[in-house]
Amino acid sequence: MRCTVIGCCGGCCRVNEACSAYLLSCQGEHLLLDCGSGAASMLQNALPLQELHHVLLSHYHYDHCSDAGALSYGRLIQMQTGAAQQPLHFYGLPVEPYFERLTMEPYTYAQTIGADDKLQIGPFCCTFHKTAHPVE
């Protein structure tokens, strides 16, 4: 498994950088952990967007999720033009109506996760736990 830091800025990204976004790659599958501001642009330095399979959102502060809509709409365009063949899957907590709008069948799907769920996402086994966030 390989982890590529796409962005690690907090709050607001700097020029040519991105907020929280970490790309996990294993066995030809790609999972993006968070996609804060600037992530959709910076991700393309590591991976063509049509090769991204999954996006896992840890929470809904903008520095962790603001580019999710761009990735969702981008996949719709990519599939309609034939640039991508597979839908993009989003995973996140069900507490935000914004998350539900990421589903645009058959292009994107949003699957909710619970605080203590265990989920197999491609080759990645993900276990979730509720934690305290310092700015909540």
Label each region the model flagged:
Residues 1-47, 136:
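Conserved beta-strand hairpin/beta-sheet module of binuclear metal-dependent hydrolase folds
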Residues 8-11, 77-78, 131:
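Short beta-turn/strand-loop junction motif enriched in small, turn-promoting residues
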Residues 37-87:
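Active-site metal-binding motif and surrounding structural segment of the metallo-beta-lactamase
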Residues 83-136:
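Metallo-beta-lactamase
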